[in-house]
């Protein structure tokens, strides 16, 4: 697959040799990050079958240019799909195109299917009724708000309206509320010959299918059986291989039928861009962004450099949060990178192995069906990214991460000399055994002091224990562990000997890790939202809100009342960006930088 940029839109071209191609249309908002691995998997599955594919980000989404909360975007997205069709034709010579979309992407694909090259549609759990879709979004937002710590919940506002970080303008919501895909398709001037629909519930797309059938379209419907295991936060999401392979098979069958009908099939170029071109540049008002491939594993990232920045200077490595692609949940990492560029600071947002657009973790290229969010390979890849940037001449490499991304940032700083500073937001633990499953980790989080403390005063909680519905042993173990940590925090000298003797990468004790950061000279800022469960370990080992870290010279903690766990609230992201800007500009460069230019085609030498 090859990264390309067209009209400010970032995309990936997957090679094929036929005259029939596919354009994949992304879902929107939080579902874009949740659905990314499925879209990549489908593109690769089609490419293996010899079908050229273009998957891309609409303007104002993903890595493309544009601000993501401006006005109503529906018509703009339809134009973007038309531009993608034309670019696929130019690159590969295809004469027919299938549009395939997931969720709102399926809706947009249908609305764009009047394009003369489009002969078929594959719709995966399409949004057929806009009002129902908005109700789903509202329910999801309400669930998120209800699960916030009380302090953070109290400061939430309804405007700007956002769902898991994606802002929806009033104009956009108004447009969505009036969306009836069946009605829209009944008035569309031209329709494709064939349509495949994978429904998340039986009959969910009946109104649309009836309209298409009445207008003579060949419609095939199937159940999206693995939808609900798939469409959830990336840490838990399971790749829906069954449905994706069925969709690819249906598309391939249509391609074969078309070739059989055409006595003289159009010839298409067999290959499309075997490597990155130097025109794959994303230009925004504040930055120049380039796709880069680096390291022995061929990791992928976007290097974002300020337009007016001087050579060298500080640079931020923005890590993956859970299994989310380098763009971040609801485009958070893109917004942060471009905001920091406006402040004169460069950044690299990249994907570790097994995540986003980087290679799989497995040597045989097999994709993980479920993300491994605390994998040692992720820590190694963060270290590789930092070392690569240091070689490029940046004087201070700062690694930034949220939750599991904070963990990989912190752990990488223990093993990579190139890392000069770390900004860890809502770090849950200083050490997570790699063998610990996500389910086991979540079970342990049920017994944090933030949850157990208030529960002690609630009789109904004790009734769960007395009735056997909640185990007493894990609760007692949690209290004992917390008490032991607090006792140890009164004797800071106990762990110093371990730091000298142990390999920094294998350290497990929070005190030893902090002492190692001190010895290595890594400036560290630990940022927490008020009430975040990560405070449990910080408070136990370093006093309330980490006050005992004042004994150190390089490690500090800050607790903010308006910061939610994932920085979905736009004000929380703004707060953390401002703190990061101040922190980075206070760093002292080690030496004058000597810049190594980015290699031709955007592909950087392997380390």
Task: Tell where the protein language model's regions lie, with residue ranges.
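Catalytic active-site module of serine/aspartate enzymes centered on a nucleophile-bearing elbow/loop
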Residues: 225-284, 561-607
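Short, surface-exposed "cap/lid" segments of acyl-processing enzymes
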Residues: 16-57, 306-352, 361
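Alpha/beta-hydrolase fold nucleophile elbow
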Residues: 91-103, 390-403
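Alpha/beta-hydrolase active-site loop
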Residues: 38, 69-91, 365-391
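N-terminal cap/lid segment of alpha/beta-hydrolase-fold proteins
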Residues: 1-20, 253-314, 569
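Glycine-rich "HGGG/HGxG" loop immediately N-terminal to the catalytic nucleophile
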Residues: 57-72, 350-370
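The alpha/beta-hydrolase serine catalytic core
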Residues: 72, 117-248, 373, 418-577, ...
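Gly/Ala-rich beta-loop-alpha elbow adjacent to hydrolase catalytic centers
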Residues: 100-109, 125, 400-409
């Amino acid at each position: 697959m090859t990264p390309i940029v067209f009209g400010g839109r970032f995309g990936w071209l997957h090679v094929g040799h036929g005259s029939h191609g596919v354009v994949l249309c992304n879902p929107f908002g939080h579902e874009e990050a949740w659905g990314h691995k499925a879209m990549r998997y489908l593109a690769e599955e089609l490419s293996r079958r010899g079908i050229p594919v273009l998957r891309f980000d609409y303007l104002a989404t993903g890595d493309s240019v544009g601000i993501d909360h401006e006005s109503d975007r529906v018509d703009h997205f339809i134009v973007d799909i038309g531009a993608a069709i034309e670019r696929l034709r130019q690159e590969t010579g295809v004469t027919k195109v299938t549009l395939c979309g997931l969720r709102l992407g399926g809706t947009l694909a249908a609305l764009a299917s009047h394009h003369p090259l489009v002969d078929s549609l594959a719709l995966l759990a399409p949004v057929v009724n806009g009002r129902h879709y908005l109700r789903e979004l509202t329910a999801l937002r309400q669930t998120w708000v209800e699960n916030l710590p009380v302090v953070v919940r109290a400061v939430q506002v309804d405007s700007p309206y956002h769902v898991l970080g994606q802002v929806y303008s009033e104009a956009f919501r108004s447009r969505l509320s009036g969306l009836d895909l069946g009605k829209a398709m009944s008035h569309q001037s031209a329709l494709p010959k064939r349509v495949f629909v994978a429904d998340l519930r039986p009959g969910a797309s009946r109104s649309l299918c009836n309209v298409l059938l009445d207008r003579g379209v060949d419609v095939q419907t199937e159940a999206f059986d693995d939808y609900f295991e798939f469409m959830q936060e990336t840490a838990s999401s399971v790749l829906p291989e069954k449905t994706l392979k069925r969709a690819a098979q249906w598309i391939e069958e249509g391609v074969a039928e078309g070739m059989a009908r055409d006595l003289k099939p159009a010839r298409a170029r067999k290959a499309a861009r075997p490597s990155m071109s130097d025109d794959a540049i994303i230009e925004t008002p504040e930055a120049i962004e380039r796709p880069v491939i680096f390291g022995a594993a061929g990791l992928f990232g976007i290097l974002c450099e300020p337009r007016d920045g001087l050579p060298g200077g500080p640079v931020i490595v923005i890590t993956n949060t859970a299994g989310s692609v380098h763009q971040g949940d609801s485009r958070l990492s893109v917004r942060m990178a471009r905001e920091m560029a406006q402040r004169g600071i460069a950044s690299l947002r990249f994907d570790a192995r097994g995540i986003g657009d980087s290679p799989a973790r497995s040597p045989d290229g097999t994709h993980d069906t479920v993300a491994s969010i605390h994998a040692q390979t992720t820590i190694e890849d963060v270290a590789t990214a930092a070392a690569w940037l240091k070689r490029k001449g940046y004087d201070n490499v700062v690694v930034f991460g949220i939750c599991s991304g904070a963990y990989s940032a912190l752990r990488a700083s223990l093993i990579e000399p190139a890392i000069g500073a770390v900004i860890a937001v809502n770090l849950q633990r200083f050490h997570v055994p790699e063998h610990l499953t996500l389910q086991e980790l979540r079970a342990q989080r049920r017994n944090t002091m933030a949850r157990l403390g208030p529960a002690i005063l609630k009789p109904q909680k004790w009734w769960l224990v007395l009735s056997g519905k909640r185990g007493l042993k894990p609760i007692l173990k949690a209290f004992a562990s917390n008490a032991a940590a607090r006792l140890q925090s009164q004797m800071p000298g106990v762990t110093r000997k371990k730091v000298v003797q142990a390999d920094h990468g294998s350290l497990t004790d929070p005190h030893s890790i902090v002492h190692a950061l001190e010895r290595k000279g890594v400036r560290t800022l630990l940022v927490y939202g008020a009430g975040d469960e990560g405070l449990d370990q910080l408070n136990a080992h370093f006093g309330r809100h980490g006050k005992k870290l004042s004994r150190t010279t390089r490690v500090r903690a800050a607790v903010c009342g308006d910061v939610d766990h994932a920085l979905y609230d736009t004000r929380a992201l703004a707060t953390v960006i401002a703190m990061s800007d101040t922190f980075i500009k206070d760093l002292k460069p080690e030496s004058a930088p000597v810049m190594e230019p980015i290699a031709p085609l955007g592909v950087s030498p392997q380390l």
